[in-house]
Amino acid sequence: MKRKTKLDKKSKWVLDMKFGVSSLVFLPESLTSSMEKIAEHNFDAWEIVCEGTHYLSPKNIKYLMELRDRYEVEIVVHAPFSDLNPASMNERVRKLTVECIRDAIEGAFELDSEVVVVHPGYIPELWSNYVSEILDNNFSTLSEIVEIAEDYGIKIGLENMPNFRGVLGITPESLLEIVKDIDSKNLGITFDIGHANTAGNPAEFVEKLQNIGIGIIHVHAHDNNGYDDEHLKIGEGNINFIEVLEKLKEIGYDGVISIENKNIRDAVKSKEILKEYLEIVNEKVAEKEKIEE
């Protein structure tokens, strides 16, 4: 029997978080097969990664609208990234990046999604001595993407990246450097807990983002041991998820947490564990409020 919690009273801290699962769990499976598994395992949302068979073509968008309505699953969109680079020194690559992300934004609009996740650019080894130019390119491309998002009423969630050589947007400070000159309410951060763990303490990462005034609008969850982007099941790495969830509640986050594991079995287990952790956090908060009354 599930234990009861002291959460019946209204609380500014007790906020509902929804648990989603990423296309990364399913690719290259079909949309139908993926959605059936999502519904079977009671995920609240599906983060569609616009790659391969899950690219948001007009045909796929129409079909996803039917699946979404049939299974009553919320859709979040992750823009394509594998062959693209918003910071590229090649103008044609930057233009292609914008057009592909435009497809994701338009698809998100059709699917009633609020957020499109976007990766910042990276510095190719050939251009490692041209960081200033790379950053300028990244700014120009992201600015154009945000303008498109504003036209559709979509929010762009710029994702923090793992601590790999040449990657932009690894730390809160580097994210600030990217977004500081883009004045738009349609731009925020997709906080990737696993990526943050390769760059330090994920809970402190949340606090730093809050302190420098960058809002978290979406969250990715997976585990690792701090050295590589392993996408392990929750509990198999060294991340203190209870501490991270506490920080997310402190800043008032009540959106989707998308689970990014390597298979559906791990994703389902991760969801179960995260729900248990969230219950623990809620109980701690309720007890704290009781003491303060």
UniProtKB/Swiss-Prot annotation:
Q: What is this protein called?
A: Uncharacterized protein MJ1311
Q: Which family does it belong to?
A: To M.jannaschii MJ1614 and MJ0008.
* InterPro entries to which the protein is assigned, alphabetical: AP_endonuc_2, IolE/XylAMocC-like, Xyl_isomerase-like_sf, Xyl_isomerase-like_TIM-brl
Coiled-coil residue windows: none
Q: Which SMART domains match?
A: AP2Ec (SM00518)
What species was this sequence derived from? Methanocaldococcus jannaschii (strain ATCC 43067 / DSM 2661 / JAL-1 / JCM 10045 / NBRC 100440)
Q: What is the lineage of its organism?
A: Archaea, Methanobacteriati, Methanobacteriota, Methanomada group, Methanococci
Q: What's one Pfam family here? A: AP_endonuc_2
Biological processes annotated in GO: DNA repair
A GO molecular function assigned to this protein is: DNA binding
Q: Tell me where the transmembrane regions lie.
A: none
**What PANTHER family does this protein map onto?**
HYDROXYPYRUVATE ISOMERASE, XYLOSE ISOMERASE-LIKE TIM BARREL DOMAIN-CONTAINING PROTEIN
